[in-house]
Amino acid sequence: MVPPPPSRGGAARGQLGRSLGPLLLLLALGHTWTYREEPEDGDREICSESKIATTKYPCLKSSGELTTCYRKKCCKGYKFVLGQCIPEDYDVCAEAPCEQQCTDNFGRVLCTCYPGYRYDRERHRKREKPYCLDIDECASSNGTLCAHICINTLGSYRCECREGYIREDDGKTCTRGDKYPNDTGHEKSENMVKAGTCCATCKEFYQMKQTVLQLKQKIALLPNNAADLGKYITGDKVLASNTYLPGPPGLPGGQGPPGSPGPKGSPGFPGMPGPPGQPGPRGSMGPMGPSPDLSHIKQGRRGPVGPPGAPGRDGSKGERGAPGPRGSPGPPGSFDFLLLMLADIRNDITELQEKVFGHRTHSSAEEFPLPQEFPSYPEAMDLGSGDDHPRRTETRDLRAPRDFYP
């Protein structure tokens, strides 16, 4: 039985189901899948006990290879001052790190000298205190600061006048005049008018003296008890007499309450510098600077190979190696070479005699046969190594001829 062919509507529904299946699966899984952005390594920095944080960041090597670099910096809320990380709200001048004046320059210590002092860089380089030295204004001005006499002081100077002169209000000019002129009570003494001092005429001084005397007399006429004091206040006046004598002084009273503190005085002159202290410990390494921008650097092709370098030095002679195995014995030796050498020497002697004497001299010694004459020699024999022939008892005289002269 043949099954009926599928209808067009069923085929369309099957194709639609196959195409929508993956989409429905993604929609179903979308509720369980979430996207989360991982924080960078720089956001996960950990602050150590020394308040120094280490941050990792990608960087390039000189060869162009990507690697990881590390940067050290102070933790958040801290700043780097004198080799260590301190809180940002900390006063860097609180511990007096400078010799004279200290300024907090955006978290860094800025040391300066007082007016009238100069900074000596060479002494600071050698760690020889003091670093701030007094300026001798009198010597550096060539006598132009004061009219008469210039006296140098720590951080400043003052002017003095010679005998018969008085100093003016500017503290530098001197005019001729008496130091203590006769004052009639209506003129002020010129030498008393100085910067930072009070002055008064003789008339004013006399008036103040009379006023003080009157106050003393009124105080002496005051009653000793409260009743008489009340009468005195209500209007009962007691006439003062110039002949009244004060009574004996009373007993000292108890200690009164302490008074309020006076105004702050002006700072005194700086004292002598103390001996130099021991050098402090070496500070910790500062944080690494920002990484350079290498995005504009392009990596080029590799260049050609350069010429070979100079040869290195010869090494030392090595140790002698172990001796090798002993070889097999060689062929038997022969005296042919020795006889040839003796014949060559004899020939040289003969040529030397011909050159010296003009003719060949005959020796009474036995002549040696040449190798090519061995077969025709009457006593030709095999002169080998001596292993195949018995030893001869008779010997030949193989010495060279000794009679060179005729």
From Swiss-Prot:
- Gene name on record? CCBE1
Which cysteines pair up through disulfides? They are C138-C150, C146-C159, C161-C174
- Ranges of residues in domain Collagen-like: 245-290, 300-333
CDD domains from the UniProt entry = EGF_CA
Is Disulfide bond among this UniProt entry's keywords? yes
Q: Which Pfam families match?
A: Collagen, EGF_CA
| Family per similarity comment | Belongs to the CCBE1 family.
Asked whether the keyword Ribonucleoprotein is assigned, the reply is no
Source organism of the structure: Homo sapiens
Bias class Low complexity marks the residues at 281-292
Biased composition of type Basic and acidic residues is found at 386-406
> What protein name is recorded for this chain?
Collagen and calcium-binding EGF domain-containing protein 1
Stated role: Required for lymphangioblast budding and angiogenic sprouting from venous endothelium during embryogenesis.
Give me the ranges of the annotated region Disordered.
244-335, 360-406
Would you tell me the Gene Ontology cellular component terms?
collagen trimer; extracellular matrix; extracellular space
Q: Which disease is it linked to?
A: Hennekam lymphangiectasia-lymphedema syndrome 1: A form of Hennekam lymphangiectasia-lymphedema syndrome, a generalized lymph-vessels dysplasia characterized by intestinal lymphangiectasia with severe lymphedema of the limbs, genitalia and face. In addition, affected individuals have unusual facies and some manifest intellectual disability. HKLLS1 inheritance is autosomal recessive.
Give the chief site where it resides: secreted
